[in-house]
Swiss-Prot record:
PANTHER family: PHOSPHOLIPASE A2 FAMILY MEMBER, PHOSPHOLIPASE A2, MEMBRANE ASSOCIATED. The record marks 112, 117 as: Cationic membrane-docking site (MDoS). This is Basic phospholipase A2 homolog BaTX. The record marks 105, 108 as: Important residue of the cationic membrane-docking site (MDoS). Its main location: secreted. InterPro entries: PLipase_A2 (IPR001211), PLipase_A2_Asp_AS (IPR033112), PLipase_A2_dom (IPR016090), PLipase_A2_dom_sf (IPR036444), PLipase_A2_His_AS (IPR033113). GO terms for molecular function: calcium ion binding; phospholipid binding; toxin activity.
Length: 121
Protein backbone atom coordinates (compact mmCIF):
# COMPACT_ATOMS: atom_id res chain seq x y z
CA UNK A 1 0.00 0.00 0.00
CA UNK A 2 1.00 3.63 -0.15
CA UNK A 3 1.74 3.40 3.58
CA UNK A 4 4.47 0.76 3.18
CA UNK A 5 5.84 2.47 0.07
CA UNK A 6 6.16 5.77 1.93
CA UNK A 7 7.84 4.08 4.87
CA UNK A 8 10.38 2.37 2.59
CA UNK A 9 11.19 5.62 0.78
CA UNK A 10 11.72 7.42 4.10
CA UNK A 11 13.97 4.60 5.37
CA UNK A 12 16.06 4.46 2.19
CA UNK A 13 16.33 8.17 1.32
CA UNK A 14 15.67 10.02 4.58
CA UNK A 15 13.24 12.23 2.61
CA UNK A 16 9.57 12.88 3.34
CA UNK A 17 7.97 10.75 0.60
CA UNK A 18 4.83 12.83 0.03
CA UNK A 19 6.64 16.18 0.00
CA UNK A 20 9.71 15.07 -1.94
CA UNK A 21 8.25 12.58 -4.42
CA UNK A 22 4.46 13.11 -4.38
CA UNK A 23 4.51 15.30 -7.50
CA UNK A 24 8.11 15.09 -8.73
CA UNK A 25 8.59 15.57 -12.46
CA UNK A 26 6.58 13.33 -14.84
CA UNK A 27 6.28 9.96 -13.07
CA UNK A 28 6.59 10.36 -9.30
CA UNK A 29 3.17 10.62 -7.67
CA UNK A 30 -0.16 10.25 -9.47
CA UNK A 31 -0.28 9.69 -13.20
CA UNK A 32 2.68 9.80 -15.52
CA UNK A 33 3.43 10.26 -19.19
CA UNK A 34 6.25 11.16 -21.56
CA UNK A 35 9.97 10.57 -21.25
CA UNK A 36 11.32 10.33 -17.71
CA UNK A 37 13.27 13.56 -17.16
CA UNK A 38 16.11 12.41 -14.89
CA UNK A 39 17.28 9.31 -13.01
CA UNK A 40 14.92 10.00 -10.09
CA UNK A 41 11.95 10.31 -12.47
CA UNK A 42 13.07 7.09 -14.22
CA UNK A 43 12.91 5.26 -10.87
CA UNK A 44 9.25 6.26 -10.63
CA UNK A 45 8.61 5.30 -14.27
CA UNK A 46 10.04 1.80 -13.71
CA UNK A 47 7.97 1.54 -10.51
CA UNK A 48 4.74 2.34 -12.38
CA UNK A 49 5.65 -0.31 -14.98
CA UNK A 50 6.29 -2.81 -12.18
CA UNK A 51 2.81 -2.12 -10.77
CA UNK A 52 1.24 -2.68 -14.21
CA UNK A 53 2.59 -6.25 -14.24
CA UNK A 54 0.86 -7.15 -10.96
CA UNK A 55 -2.32 -9.19 -11.09
CA UNK A 56 -4.53 -10.05 -8.16
CA UNK A 57 -3.75 -7.18 -5.81
CA UNK A 58 -4.24 -3.43 -5.52
CA UNK A 59 -0.85 -1.67 -5.24
CA UNK A 60 -2.24 1.47 -3.62
CA UNK A 61 -4.47 -0.22 -1.03
CA UNK A 62 -3.28 -3.75 -0.27
CA UNK A 63 -1.04 -4.00 2.78
CA UNK A 64 1.96 -6.30 2.99
CA UNK A 65 4.62 -6.99 5.57
CA UNK A 66 8.33 -6.35 5.36
CA UNK A 67 11.14 -5.91 7.81
CA UNK A 68 14.07 -3.52 8.02
CA UNK A 69 17.15 -5.58 8.93
CA UNK A 70 20.64 -4.08 8.93
CA UNK A 71 19.40 -1.17 6.78
CA UNK A 72 17.99 -3.63 4.24
CA UNK A 73 14.35 -4.10 3.23
CA UNK A 74 13.28 -7.74 3.47
CA UNK A 75 9.91 -8.58 1.90
CA UNK A 76 8.06 -11.27 3.81
CA UNK A 77 4.85 -12.45 2.16
CA UNK A 78 3.49 -15.85 1.18
CA UNK A 79 0.96 -14.37 -1.25
CA UNK A 80 2.80 -14.03 -4.58
CA UNK A 81 1.13 -10.78 -5.64
CA UNK A 82 1.82 -9.10 -2.29
CA UNK A 83 5.43 -10.33 -2.43
CA UNK A 84 5.82 -8.86 -5.94
CA UNK A 85 4.17 -5.63 -4.77
CA UNK A 86 6.67 -5.41 -1.91
CA UNK A 87 9.55 -6.07 -4.33
CA UNK A 88 8.31 -3.27 -6.65
CA UNK A 89 8.23 -0.83 -3.73
CA UNK A 90 11.61 -2.01 -2.45
CA UNK A 91 13.16 -1.50 -5.89
CA UNK A 92 11.89 2.08 -6.24
CA UNK A 93 13.00 3.01 -2.71
CA UNK A 94 16.52 1.70 -3.41
CA UNK A 95 16.57 3.35 -6.84
CA UNK A 96 15.58 6.72 -5.33
CA UNK A 97 18.36 6.39 -2.73
CA UNK A 98 20.93 5.47 -5.39
CA UNK A 99 19.91 8.50 -7.44
CA UNK A 100 19.63 11.12 -4.70
CA UNK A 101 22.34 13.07 -6.53
CA UNK A 102 19.93 13.69 -9.45
CA UNK A 103 17.08 14.89 -7.22
CA UNK A 104 16.32 18.56 -7.91
CA UNK A 105 13.92 20.47 -5.63
CA UNK A 106 12.82 22.71 -8.51
CA UNK A 107 11.00 19.73 -10.08
CA UNK A 108 9.15 18.83 -6.89
CA UNK A 109 5.79 20.21 -8.08
CA UNK A 110 6.24 19.86 -11.84
CA UNK A 111 3.09 20.35 -13.92
CA UNK A 112 2.26 16.94 -15.39
CA UNK A 113 0.62 18.44 -18.53
CA UNK A 114 4.11 19.63 -19.52
CA UNK A 115 5.16 15.99 -19.86
CA UNK A 116 4.74 14.96 -23.48
CA UNK A 117 2.79 11.80 -24.29
CA UNK A 118 4.83 8.70 -25.18
CA UNK A 119 6.85 6.09 -23.29
CA UNK A 120 4.55 3.24 -22.35
CA UNK A 121 5.88 0.26 -20.40
Amino acid sequence: SLFELGKMILQETGKNPAKSYGAYYCYCGWGGQGQPKDATDRCCYVHKCCYKKLTGCNPKKDRYSYSWKDKTIVCGENNSCLKELCECDKAVAICLRENLNTYNKKYRYYLKPLCKKADAC
